[in-house]
Regions:
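Conserved N-terminal phosphate-binding loop of PLP-dependent enzymes in the Aspartate aminotransferase
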Residues: 1-141
């Protein structure tokens, strides 16, 4: 149907970089402990954040899964939007801004989760927890 000198264009036609990236991702998932590592590091980060709040006597709750979690301040449990509306969103935002000053960049929206990826190292978790502790201590409620 298509003769000499005729090209067929399309958004996803012949997307060699995309296929190469997908192949590399599948290879890593097949050969490395990606999910186990994400769960372990995410749990460590979640537990560390919770411990920091607990040590400072701050009521909070952790939500989600280790590789994709969030937290809320001022509530022990959140099961619906009304409960979330009662949380200390301004305090959350102040902590986020203090974190950004220290090189950690979570989303400003407390409903958005923190995402981990396989590239995050144990040192990244350590550095994040240090920045989190400093940020919580630096921000007044």
């Amino acid at each position: 149907i298509i003769g000499q000198g005729v090209a067929q264009g399309g958004t996803y036609n012949n997307n060699k970089p995309g296929v190469a990236a997908a192949w590399a991702t599948l290879t890593i998932l097949e050969n490395e402990p990606v999910m186990k590592t994400l769960e372990q590091r995410g749990k460590r980060l979640m537990d560390g954040i919770s411990d920091i709040f607990t040590e400072d006597g701050i009521i909070h709750c952790m939500n989600g899964y280790p590789a994709m979690f969030s937290y809320a301040v001022g509530a022990e449990k959140i099961t619906n939007q009304r409960e979330w509306n009662e949380t200390e969103k301004d305090y959350y935002l102040a902590i986020v801004e203090a974190l950004m000053e220290r090189g950690v960049m979570p989303d400003h929206d407390a409903r958005e989760p923190w995402f981990l990826c396989y590239a995050h190292s144990e040192k990244d978790i350590d550095d994040t927890l240090t920045a989190f502790s400093e940020s919580v201590k630096s921000v007044s409620r």
